[in-house]
């Protein structure tokens, strides 16, 4: 089975893309290290304007869950993890990620018209590779993330009866 056959359906892609966009905004705000659980902290955050544009983000529980899944799955490939973070957390376009990888790419064996030889990959090759890496990353993350959301236990708020 080749990488080209590993595709998600449109519904699956939309589901994981939506969650990863929310997670990326959550990671970008720096909440990975600090947990905002008190009402005062949430109120203060809403009163003080932030210095960066806000985008919709997930809550802390969802963010921590997604981070655990992404870390456990993407630790295999650091390049794919970097591309995933650049795309979802920092909001970089596929083109800007590709142009960065084109700038830092070192020559490697590539098939050319004259045969196989050492060459630096073109920007189009880098764009194709970044697109394939993102698609493969989403495919690899879909099943563990869906399973994690289904298996987690929701903590219901306990109401005290006075």
Task: List each model region and its residues.
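N-terminal interaction/assembly modules
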Residues: 1-75, 103-111, 115-118, 122, ...
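A short pre-motif secondary-structure segment
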Residues: 83-84
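Short helix-to-turn junction characteristic of helix-turn-helix DNA-binding domains
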Residues: 87-91
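Residues within the helices of the helix-turn-helix
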Residues: 95-105
